């Protein structure tokens, strides 16, 4: 279900404050965040954000095509290591 258009997109307050401070100073540095539910807004374009995937922080460079998506979409939490082999010896 999508978010109502009457509401603004969700962005964590402390995370939004960090972005605004960097934009005022016109600096680019990596911002570490655990807020995977935050929506990418146009003020974030050009920043590198390290998004937590449950184990590490993955640095993601924000581009204009990412606006409107959630931060968590770009930091996968699961690593697929393949299906189990069909080992007939273990069945005996």
UniProtKB/Swiss-Prot annotation:
Name of the protein in its database record: Small ribosomal subunit protein uS19c
Family, similarity comment: Belongs to the universal ribosomal protein uS19 family.
Key words of the record: Chloroplast, Plastid, Ribonucleoprotein, Ribosomal protein, RNA-binding, rRNA-binding
Organism name: Liriodendron tulipifera
Alphabetized Pfam families for the sequence: Ribosomal_S19
Localization of this protein: Plastid, Chloroplast
Domain of life of the source: Eukaryota
GO cellular component assignments: chloroplast; mitochondrial small ribosomal subunit
InterPro entries registered for this protein in UniProt: Ribosomal_uS19, Ribosomal_uS19_bac-type, Ribosomal_uS19_CS, Ribosomal_uS19_SF
MF GO annotations: rRNA binding; structural constituent of ribosome
Biological processes, Gene Ontology terms: ribosomal small subunit assembly; translation
Top-level taxonomy: Eukaryota, Viridiplantae, Streptophyta, Embryophyta, Tracheophyta
Chief location: plastid
The protein's role, per its UniProt record: Protein S19 forms a complex with S13 that binds strongly to the 16S ribosomal RNA.
């Amino acid at each position: 279900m999508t978010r109502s258009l009457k509401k603004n997109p969700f962005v964590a307050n402390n995370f939004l404050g960090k972005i605004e401070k960097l934009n005022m100073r016109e600096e680019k540095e990596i911002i570490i965040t655990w807020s995977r539910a935050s929506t990418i807004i146009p003020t974030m374009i050009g920043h590198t954000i390290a998004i937590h995937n449950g184990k590490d922080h993955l640095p993601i460079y924000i581009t204009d095509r990412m606006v409107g998506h959630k931060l968590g979409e770009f930091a996968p939490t699961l690593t697929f290591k393949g299906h189990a082999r069909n080992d007939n010896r273990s069945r005996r």
